[in-house]
Amino acid sequence: MNQILEKPENKKWDTKMPGKLTVSIGEYSDKGRKEINQDFHGSYYPEEPLLSSKGIALAIADGINNSYISQIASETSVAGFLDDYYDTSKSSAVKRSAEQVLIATNSWLHAQSQKTHGHPDNDKDYVCTFSSLILKSTTAHILHIGDTRIYRFRAGKLEQLTTDHCLRVSDEISYLNRGLGIYSILDIDYQTTPMKLDDVFFMTTDGVYEHVSNDFIIDTIEEHIDDLDLAAELLVEQAYQVGSSDSLTAQLVKIDELP
């Protein structure tokens, strides 16, 4: 359910073209101990001229646990973003294009949830977290709502780049206070960061990062840097083995060459 775009079997693009951004991507997702996978993820690696004008996009979303239809929100958010972002004007800035798409998605999700309010089924909210990484030229653009996370692994160090939008009541209980579909007005975190050769960006959901240590993440990336699909699978497997009860998703993207 999570593979929304056709890609080569190993999802690794390694054709070296001088002067062009070149990356390797690895992805893995599993429903874990859930009945269904409430996570959704995807990526799109376009050819020219879109590669230069719009960049490479990855997105990840996690539907809220207390809604049995939130997987629709996560799938709609990721699939819609990867489709609609590339339909925006080629001359429009990344921030404007991406926010335009997310605002429209938020409005649709919020409207669907409002239709169900007042009915006996109060567990039918179209709400999810969402994080996107857009790699264009030598800059990484990050858009983020909720508690999915984006990390950067550089020179042996792992750094969390996003902030969790949740209210933590205890070690076991937290509440999402920002997400797609919660409110009619969307508040998006946006930032940019320069990329360096061999940077690895790690995108994941709480089903993974709450159960896997930073040291394990670092060791897994370093050991399997040439097979990021395997690295992503091992991160998910480790989270499951130590007791994660949530859906689990991991995405990795390595910067192989910069313009």
Listing of model-derived features with the role each one plays in the protein:
Residues 1-259:
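PP2C/PPM-type serine/threonine phosphatase catalytic domain
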